[in-house]
């Protein structure tokens, strides 16, 4: 601990990594993650609703152009996997891409700005980037896998069809006895596959944004006059990371949904 009440570099980093939490253990709630996730989700819905309400058939404005570009890009991506437009898959992909993009953009706000303002009103900890909280990224990836299971249930007309679909791949047999014998191995591999999807989706998003936030914090330790060049360069590079991670999460979700359709 530094003398005079000053925090060491390690203590500053630790302070920025702590969420505003209520409760303990499994029942702990990260209030800052919940608040900013809901706020950004509502902002995304309001923004697209406003653009749609003001949409014109003539010459579109800048906001309408951007919204149409995003919509057409996602619709064409879905068509590439499914061969046709799918409003259900397209809506899911659009929601995930925009929501995660809004999450990630928060990482471009100066790292000390909002936490310092929150400290003035008695809030000791505040993390404003939901993507840097593994609880948020795991919740999102678990939701995606649960949606794929719901589609598996629907496409196979019930529980028995769902179990048959999950228990007949990747090892196949034409005979009934062979299918029964291979069912436990196939089903176990499907469970492992779904768990791997959850871990890979969540840790990829969390790891990239968490590392980016750490770099921003480390840059603030430099003398004030020397922060501009590395900070600006990293911010420009991070814009690519912010967009790319939202795209990767979206495209993998579409891939998983297309795999369900094919089976």
Curated annotation (Swiss-Prot):
It is a multi-pass membrane protein. GO terms for cellular component: plasma membrane; proton-transporting ATP synthase complex. One of its GO terms (molecular function) is proton-transporting ATP synthase activity, rotational mechanism. CDD domains: ATP-synt_Fo_a_6. GO terms for biological process: proton motive force-driven plasma membrane ATP synthesis. Gene3D superfamilies: ATP synthase, F0 complex, subunit A. The chain crosses the membrane at residues 31-51, 89-109, 133-153, 205-225, 235-255. Belongs to the ATPase A chain family. F-type ATPases have 2 components, CF(1) - the catalytic core - and CF(0) - the membrane proton channel. CF(1) has five subunits: alpha(3), beta(3), gamma(1), delta(1), epsilon(1). CF(0) has three main subunits: a(1), b(2) and c(9-12). The alpha and beta chains form an alternating ring which encloses part of the gamma chain. CF(1) is attached to CF(0) by a central stalk formed by the gamma and epsilon chains, while a peripheral stalk is formed by the delta and b chains. HAMAP family: ATP_synth_a_bact. This is ATP synthase subunit a. It comes from Dichelobacter nodosus (strain VCS1703A). The lineage of its organism: Bacteria, Pseudomonadati, Pseudomonadota, Gammaproteobacteria, Cardiobacteriales. The gene is atpB.
């Amino acid at each position: 601990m530094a003398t005079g009440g000053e925090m060491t570099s390690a203590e500053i980093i630790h302070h920025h990594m702590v969420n505003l939490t209520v409760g303990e253990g499994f029942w702990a709630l990260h209030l800052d993650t919940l608040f900013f996730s809901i706020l950004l989700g509502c902002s995304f819905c309001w923004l697209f609703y406003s653009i749609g309400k003001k949409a014109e058939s003539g010459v579109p404005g800048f906001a309408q152009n951007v919204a149409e570009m995003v919509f057409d890009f996602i619709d064409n991506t879905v068509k590439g996997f499914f061969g046709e437009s799918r409003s259900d898959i397209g809506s899911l992909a659009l929601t995930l891409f925009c929501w995660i993009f809004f999450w990630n953009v928060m990482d471009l706000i100066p790292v000390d700005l909002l936490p310092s303002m929150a400290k003035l009103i008695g809030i000791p900890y505040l993390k404003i980037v939901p993507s840097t909280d593994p609880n948020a990224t795991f919740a999102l990836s678990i939701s995606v896998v649960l949606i794929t299971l719901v589609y598996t249930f629907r496409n196979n007309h019930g529980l028995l069809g769902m179990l048959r679909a999950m228990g007949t791949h990747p090892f196949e047999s034409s005979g009934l006895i062979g299918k029964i014998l291979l069912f436990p191995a196939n089903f176990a591999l499907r469970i492992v596959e779904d768990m791997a999807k959850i871990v890979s989706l969540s840790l990829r998003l969390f790891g990239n944004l968490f590392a980016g936030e750490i770099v921003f914090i480390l840059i603030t330790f430099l003398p004030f006059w020397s922060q501009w060049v590395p900070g600006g360069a990293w911010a420009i590079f991070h814009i690519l990371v912010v967009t790319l991670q939202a795209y990767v999460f979206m495209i993998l979700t579409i891939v998983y949904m297309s795999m369900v359709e094919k089976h």
